[in-house]
Regions:
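Nucleic-acid endonuclease domains
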Residues: 1-67, 72, 80-189
Length: 189
């Protein structure tokens, strides 16, 4: 079972704590194009997960419309790192997933799995300044704090096999369709 194999591999590779500076430096050294991203914890999770999954069971990535899905073997999988609380220490229960059209297409084609790593973030302005300088973002004061660290609390894997399961998840409130944004050229996603 692909889901079980993914879970076993990821349980072994996810670190007990993700330090922002260490992870960003590792991503840069590995040539990962997302090392400058402010949501480094999600891109770091994707990088280490894909690397280990590809090494142990093979796989690739897939692009549907304008959306990249993180891992594909027999099924399409999307990975997310979700913070269990915001900067004010309030619990955050919603995790934003991918574009609705691409999600529906992936479900139609093969089914779609969501791999969600939930963790407790530590927000820190000193790290934010370091990150901005490291990525070459100028010297003006950053507007909001970034996550200095991310401590994994739970790995959850969900699989939606078809449109019927998607509709059931939406009607039960397990999934919610948000208003869809626009691309940089102003056209709908």
């Amino acid at each position: 079972n692909e889901l079980v194999a993914i879970a076993r591999i990821l349980e072994r590779v996810i670190p007990a704590e993700m330090d922002g500076e260490t992870c960003v430096r590792e991503m840069r050294a590995a040539g990962d194009s997302n090392w400058k991203q402010v949501q480094w914890q999600g891109f770091y999770f994707e990088m280490i997960a894909r690397r280990e999954l590809n090494k142990q069971i093979g796989g690739t990535r897939q692009r549907l419309f304008n959306t990249d899905f993180d891992y594909v073997r027999n099924f399409v999988w999307d990975m997310k790192a979700h913070s269990s609380e915001n900067e004010r220490g309030q619990a955050t229960n919603e995790c934003i997933l991918n574009d609705a059209r691409a999600t529906e297409k992936a479900i139609e084609d093969s089914g779609l799995g969501f791999i969600i790593l939930t963790g407790k973030p530590l927000y820190d302005m000193e790290f934010t300044r370091w990150h901005k300088a490291f990525r070459g973002g100028g010297t003006d004061e950053p507007g909001r704090k970034l996550k200095k660290s991310f401590t994994p609390e739970a790995l959850e894997i969900f699989f939606v096999k078809d449109r019927t399961e998607l509709e059931s998840a939406v009607s039960s409130g397990a999934l919610k369709i948000l208003s869809q944004g626009k691309n940089s050229n102003g056209k709908p996603r």
